[in-house]
């Protein structure tokens, strides 16, 4: 649901940030995502908007130090493909992959936690830190390796008597074949070679606050077209690849 995504990712971040300021929290770290870079769907656009909120608040005089850490998928975390593939293999398949060419960044939970904590200590205010995720992994290869590591054979045209079939379901609306971690190329090194500081464009609080006010009104009016328009206004690199996908929007239509 688009409105709940906006409420959670944008206004949820804003509420937490304002609470941190009012209670004197010293450091606030936002966990962002590679989907915030040149977003093609509402989720990615709202995550980039959340980054803009913290960048704008950092430009105001307050005692809370805001930092943003942007990275990709975390192996074994909730919603990760690993637990899904394990479950599908255990149930006899098929293992579902959206596209044979789709690739994604991955890191372990331990790596992610350590780098996020270190990034928080490096922040100077409004920083966007990008973690070195290594090479992107082909999801199709990951699925095949997991089937083989389970002691099973892939069922396909070359091996029709195999155990587990891989089913290609097609990219979902707004889904990319690959993700990026940087909007621009303006980065600088930090004390940790696996953490880069990215210089990203920001928006002044006065302008952003006006868009936030308009978002609230559009949510109350269930104006989904206006919501998309405002997201594009705040995040110019948001390039929706499809019509608005939302059950409530379709019902209102």
Question: What do these predicted ranges mean?
Answer:
Residues 22, 52, 56-73, 78-253:
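Strand-loop microenvironment adjacent to phosphate/nucleotide-handling motifs in alpha/beta enzyme folds
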Residues 2-51, 56:
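Conserved Rossmann-fold NAD(P)-dependent oxidoreductase catalytic core, especially the SDR/UDP-sugar
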């Amino acid at each position: 649901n688009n409105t709940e995504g906006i409420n959670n990712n944008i206004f949820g971040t804003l509420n937490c940030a304002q609470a941190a300021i009012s209670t004197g929290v010293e450091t606030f770290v936002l966990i962002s995502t590679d989907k915030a870079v040149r977003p093609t769907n509402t989720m990615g656009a709202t995550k980039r908007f959340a980054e803009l909120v913290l960048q704008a608040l950092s430009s105001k005089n307050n005692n809370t130090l805001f930092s943003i850490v942007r990275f990709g998928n975390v192996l074994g975390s909730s919603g990760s493909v690993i637990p899904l593939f394990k479950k599908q293999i255990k149930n006899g398949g098929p293992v579902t992959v959206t596209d044979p060419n789709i690739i994604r960044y991955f890191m372990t939970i331990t790596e992610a936690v350590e780098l996020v904590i270190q990034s928080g200590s490096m922040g100077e205010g409004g920083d966007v830190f990008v973690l070195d995720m290594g090479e992107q992994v082909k999801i199709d290869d990951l699925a095949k390796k997991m089937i083989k590591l389970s002691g099973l054979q892939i069922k396909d045209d070359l091996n029709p008597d195999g155990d587990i079939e891989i089913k290609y379901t097609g990219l979902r609306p707004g889904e990319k074949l690959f993700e990026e971690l940087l909007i621009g190329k303006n980065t600088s090194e930090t004390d940790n070679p696996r953490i880069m500081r990215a210089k990203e464009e920001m928006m002044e609080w006065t302008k952003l606050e006006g868009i936030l006010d308009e978002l609230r009104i559009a949510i109350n009016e269930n104006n989904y077209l206006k919501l998309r328009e405002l997201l594009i206004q705040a995040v110019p690199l948001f390039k929706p690849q499809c019509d608005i996908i939302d059950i409530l929007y379709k019902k209102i239509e």
